[in-house]
């Protein structure tokens, strides 16, 4: 909240709606020679915007978030859905949980008249436990073979982009965690 207030941004509680509007604005700026837009937070017309993106119609828009509003944003405006698997409110740390959210995203896409298969899927994991005594209730806990199986399951769900963020405060600590 403080960051929003410090830069006189729209209300923090409206950040989802603001984000959706800004995505629409970017698409307008990137794809039209004479962009114009009238929204709740921003409006403009008769402006020149350059350079236009090389990628057509525009660079892929990755939309993060795991909540229903975020899924709707990804389904209506995104080219890729990019959830963080470790969100404590919406943990997506095993096959069943991620599959349920993907199904919900696809349902929203259909409601918006989009082909769900046109929305690419990404996934971010930032927890790892290599202790052989650790109970395997979620992905990325266990032996290298078990983690390999986790990655296979994620791919089988249609995820094409996997981001692994290893926690640590130093390069050596991070490398140690990566090298099990």
Sequence positions of predicted segments:
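Active-site-adjacent structural elements that line small-molecule/cofactor binding pockets in enzymes
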Residues: 1-180
């Amino acid at each position: 909240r403080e960051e929003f207030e410090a830069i006189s941004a729209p209300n923090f509680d409206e950040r989802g709606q603001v984000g959706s509007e800004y995505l629409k604005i970017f698409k307008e700026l990137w794809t039209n020679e004479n962009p114009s837009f009238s929204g709740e937070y921003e409006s403009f017309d008769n402006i020149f915007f350059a350079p236009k993106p090389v990628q057509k119609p525009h660079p892929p828009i990755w939309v993060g978030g795991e909540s229903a509003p975020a899924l709707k944003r990804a389904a209506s405006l995104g080219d890729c859905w990019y959830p963080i698997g470790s969100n404590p409110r919406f943990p997506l740390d095993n096959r069943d949980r991620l599959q349920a959210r993907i199904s919900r995203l696809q349902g929203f896409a259909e409601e918006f008249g989009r082909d769900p298969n046109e929305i690419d899927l990404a996934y971010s994991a930032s927890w790892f436990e290599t202790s052989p005594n650790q109970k395997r209730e979620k992905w990325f806990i266990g032996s290298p073979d078990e983690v390999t199986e986790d990655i296979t399951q994620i791919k089988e769900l249609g995820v094409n982009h996997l981001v692994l963020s290893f926690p640590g405060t130093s390069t050596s600590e991070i490398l140690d965690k990566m090298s099990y």
